[in-house]
Curated annotation (Swiss-Prot):
Coiled coil: none annotated. With S4 and S5 plays an important role in translational accuracy. CDD domains: Ribosomal_S12. The modification 3-methylthioaspartic acid is found at residue 89. PROSITE patterns: RIBOSOMAL_S12. The lineage of its organism: Bacteria, Pseudomonadati, Pseudomonadota, Betaproteobacteria, Burkholderiales. This is Small ribosomal subunit protein uS12. One of its GO terms (biological process) is translation. Belongs to the universal ribosomal protein uS12 family. Disulfide bonds: none annotated. InterPro entries: NA-bd_OB-fold, Ribosomal_uS12, Ribosomal_uS12_bac. It comes from the Bacteria. GO terms for molecular function: rRNA binding; structural constituent of ribosome; tRNA binding. SUPFAM superfamilies: Nucleic acid-binding proteins.
Length: 125
C-alpha cells in the first residue's frame, strides 16, 4: 500500500480500454464504399466460402467487413453501412455490413429474424 506522499508524486493510472472496433470511432455505424467484394475461407475446424468486402470508410479507414445472409447484390463502388461485430472464424474481420441499408438489399424470402437481415414482412397468405 503506497503512502499518501507516494501517491502525490506518482498518482494511480487507470487501465486504458482498447476498442474492439476502432474504425467506427465511437459511432454506432459508419458509411463506406466497397473497394473489393470476395469470398474467403474460415479458420481450422470450419469449412465454407464466407462473403466479405473490403470497405473504405468516410473517415479514411479501410476495413474488411462480413456480408451476412444468403445472397447479396454488392459489387465494387457499392455504398454500404457497417456496424461493429466480429466474425469468430474469420481473422481480421471485425465489422458487419448492415443488410437492407443504402446499396445492399435485404435477404429475399426471409421469414425469421427479419430485422437482422433487412427483410420486409411477407404478405399474409
Amino acid at each position: 500500500m503506497p503512502t499518501i506522499n507516494q501517491l502525490v508524486r506518482k498518482p494511480r493510472v487507470s487501465e486504458v480500454i482498447k476498442s474492439k472496433s476502432p474504425a467506427l470511432e465511437n459511432c454506432p455505424q459508419r458509411r463506406g464504399v466497397c473497394t473489393r467484394v470476395y469470398t474467403t475461407t474460415p479458420k481450422k475446424p470450419n469449412s465454407a466460402l464466407r462473403k466479405v468486402a473490403k470497405v473504405r470508410l468516410t473517415n479514411g479507414f479501410e476495413v474488411i467487413s462480413y456480408i451476412g445472409g444468403e445472397g447479396h447484390n454488392l459489387q465494387e463502388h457499392s455504398v454500404v453501412l457497417i456496424r461493429g461485430g466480429r466474425v469468430k472464424d474469420l481473422p481480421g474481420v471485425r465489422y458487419h455490413i448492415v443488410r437492407g441499408s443504402l446499396d445492399l438489399q435485404g435477404v429475399k424470402d426471409r421469414r425469421q429474424a427479419r430485422s437482422k437481415y433487412g427483410a420486409k414482412r411477407p404478405k399474409a397468405a
